[in-house]
Amino acid sequence: MSVEETGWVTVALVGKTRGNRGEVTAVVLSSRPERYQDLQEVFLFGPGLPEAGERREVEEAWYHLQTLVLKFRGVDTISEAESLYGAEVRIPASQRISLDEGEYFESDLIGCEVVDRQSGQSLGKVSAWDDGGGSGLLVVGDLLIPFARAICVEINPAAKRITVELPEGLKDLNRP
């Protein structure tokens, strides 16, 4: 893995210190918690770190009371661990875990053009993902679209396009 690589994926956010050996807690940004136990090397991005990211070897990764704990090689004191608070833990996109058919990375949906199947009109581009619903929500302008098979009938992240069949009245729910 090299720092020059593009296409980073943020997989966690560094939280508070834990213990006195330089361990940190982390906010998990994956629906597959087991993925963290295989991490060997990551790049940290954030205030006080190089703009291109700082390579860190993961010495250990485990869960304590449903909280991810990370131990980075060379981070051995509380003060060293505190300096990492808030950093984004990233990996190259090429090292993302494999998905099952019909599963998508949220980051791949951002920027997709959303097209109404009935009218053929563009509703805009997905600007964000919101976990606020059972299936998640695509944020398209001021419109929140449930990410459900019955609504998102064609999903093609490679073509940056999502075709939707919106239930009657959905457009009016979120409009000012």
Swiss-Prot record:
Organism: Solibacter usitatus (strain Ellin6076)
GO MF annotations, alphabetized: ribosome binding
Source organism superkingdom: Bacteria
Cytoplasm listed as a keyword: yes
Pfam families the record matches: PRC_RimM, RimM
Localisation: Cytoplasm
Name by which UniProt lists this protein: Ribosome maturation factor RimM
Domain PRC barrel: 101-170
GO BP, sorted A to Z: ribosomal small subunit biogenesis; rRNA processing
GO cellular component, one term: ribosome
Family as reported in the entry's similarity comment: Belongs to the RimM family.
Keyword Chaperone among UniProt keywords: yes
Signal peptide: none
HAMAP family, alphabetized: Ribosome_mat_RimM
Assembly information from the UniProt record: Binds ribosomal protein uS19.
Keywords assigned by UniProt, alphabetized: Chaperone, Cytoplasm, Ribosome biogenesis, rRNA processing
Function, in words: An accessory protein needed during the final step in the assembly of 30S ribosomal subunit, possibly for assembly of the head region. Essential for efficient processing of 16S rRNA. May be needed both before and after RbfA during the maturation of 16S rRNA. It has affinity for free ribosomal 30S subunits but not for 70S ribosomes.
Comment text on domains: The PRC barrel domain binds ribosomal protein uS19.
